[in-house]
């Protein structure tokens, strides 16, 4: 029996190896767990167009938004690990949503990491009526008047929400949470002065900052970004070690053969070095990343565990 098992295993491995050498020989479905037209979708379409050109096989974007990315991510989790169903996702679907699932799952075991596409910091902004010109001044105001300041978020459990929760934990302050359904209404109400504070992606507030309708205080990345060089980091503004970034990654289902992972990783790294892709990412205030699958796994693990601690400490419950 053992001999038959060994022969069968050898044959199976040979089939996988042969398939990997010809991969892809049919269209690849790339699940984007977000609606069409958003930042994630736009970046995904640009990258997958280049993959199509590189392999000579269609990489087709399939938008499956809903439940903060969980619906699209689940499709990939249940797919066959043959390389023909991939996940092009933001951090929200794989670092945040799993913490709010009815049956929490470990995304590090659910998916096979392929490559880190890029990352983008958030920006801490306040309405001009708030007399704070720096992070330290904002913290001082919040400490003097607990719960007097209200902050907007893109929704309960969103990156903007957990980033604000981390900020409050680190600064030792309290602010009132006002969740919205997406970034646009959160920005609109902050500009209108209905709420005072917001963590948002830079593209969504850049025009408002230039028009002095919002005041940007700092970026949430570990170091200053070339995309907004005039802004200090939150970390250098009084909260050492503070970091929160939106990031994008490509994954396959668990068990994706290493040969296919390596082919995809090599092709994606070439794509991410292309000037036109760098330009596309820059429009969303993002920088390309690249690297190995192991580097994405390490980055994802740290991000997932960090937000888990913040969510549990703040008592945040999913919608």
Spell out what each predicted region is.
Residues 1-9:
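Bacterial N-terminal signal peptides that target proteins for export
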Residues 12-19:
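N-terminal signal peptide c-region/cleavage motif recognized by signal peptidases
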Residues 20-110, 148, 156, 172-199, ...:
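N-terminal (or domain-start) structured segment
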Residues 25-27, 169-173, 233-236, 258-319:
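An extracytoplasmic/periplasmic, membrane-proximal ligand-sensing/linker region
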Residues 35-37, 91-92, 122, 127-132, ...:
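Short coil/turn segments
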Residues 78-84, 98-185, 234, 247-280:
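Hinge/capping helix and adjacent helix->loop/strand transition within the periplasmic-binding protein
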Residues 92-102, 166-170, 197-231, 308:
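A ligand-binding cleft/hinge motif common to bilobed small-molecule-binding domains
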Residues 119, 205-273, 302-305:
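C-terminal lobe and pocket-closing loops
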């Amino acid at each position: 029996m053992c001999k038959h098992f060994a022969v069968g295993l050898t044959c199976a491995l040979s089939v996988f190896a042969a398939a990997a050498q010809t991969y892809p020989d049919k269209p690849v479905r790339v699940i984007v767990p977000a609606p069409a037209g958003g930042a994630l979708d736009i970046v995904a379409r640009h990258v997958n167009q280049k993959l199509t050109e590189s392999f000579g096989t269609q990489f087709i974007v399939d938008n499956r938004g809903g439940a903060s990315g969980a619906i699209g991510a689940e499709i990939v989790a249940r797919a066959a690990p043959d390389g023909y169903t991939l996940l092009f996702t933001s951090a929200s679907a794989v670092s945040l949503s799993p913490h709010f699932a009815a049956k929490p799952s470990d995304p590090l075991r659910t998916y096979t990491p392929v490559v880190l596409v890029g990352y983008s910091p958030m920006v801490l902004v306040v309405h001009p009526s708030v007399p704070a010109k720096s992070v330290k001044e904002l913290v001082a105001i919040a400490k003097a008047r607990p719960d007097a300041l209200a902050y907007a978020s893109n929704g309960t459990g969103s990156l903007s929400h957990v980033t604000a929760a981390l900020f409050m934990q680190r600064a030792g302050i309290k602010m009132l949470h006002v969740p919205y359904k997406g970034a646009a209404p959160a920005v609109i109400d902050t500009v209108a002065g209905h709420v005072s504070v917001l963590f948002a992606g830079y593209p969504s507030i850049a025009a408002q900052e230039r028009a002095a309708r919002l005041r940007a205080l700092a970026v949430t990345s570990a170091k200053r970004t070339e995309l907004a060089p005039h802004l200090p980091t939150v970390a250098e503004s009084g909260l050492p070690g503070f970091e929160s970034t939106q990031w994008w990654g490509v994954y396959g289902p668990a068990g994706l053969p290493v040969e296919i992972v390596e082919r995809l990783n090599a092709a994606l790294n070439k794509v991410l070095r292309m000037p036109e892709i760098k330009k596309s990412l820059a429009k969303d205030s993002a920088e390309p990343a690249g690297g190995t699958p192991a580097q994405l796994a390490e980055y994802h693990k740290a991000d997932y565990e960090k937000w888990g601690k913040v969510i549990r400490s703040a008592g945040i419950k999913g919608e």
